[in-house]
Amino acid sequence: MPQPMIARRTLLAAAGLLAARGAFAQTADGRVQVRIATDHGDILAALEVAKAPVTCANFLRYVDSGRYDGSSFYRATRAPGAPTVGLIEGGIDDPRKLYPPIAHESTLMTGLKHRDGTLSMAREGLGTATSDFFICSGETSYLDANPSAPGDNAGYAAFGQVVQGMDVVRAILALPTTGVARDPAMQGQILDPPARIVSMRREG
């Protein structure tokens, strides 16, 4: 876990980065909108910059630098017997394009929840998230932090919500998952072919 002083400096740096970008792309409620253009259609997401400042600043850093352009949604997980429930995961495959990992902002810290259309950061251990993120389809509250659960119970860092384009999310979720997995635990979850992310841009 990050030390309090490190976390405080990270929060200050994130707030400064967001302020430097200006408020032109913010909605009336202070959220920042990002359009994710894919080869299956567009997804419009609203980022909760006030509630998840570290996570949103990291995501917007990749957006503003163009590093998500040409990346892909490469993974789809579907609940057994409920093919429209699950998530699609995307990110950057080239390690040279990755920024340093960020501190984990749990749902207990942000007050955000994993529900239909939630954007959240993929991770391994705490403080390992870089570019990979996922979009939820259907009820996914099991991804929230749960202090009473055994083991790693910090959940995932929710940071935004799809406001348009859930039909695109579900179309990608339904694509064939016959690709070869690097991790055996992901076998049967790798999109073949992946859904290309053409570009990501702030909207407004």
Question: What kind of region is each of these model predictions?
Answer:
Residues P2-I6, L12-G204:
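Cyclophilin-like peptidyl-prolyl cis-trans isomerases
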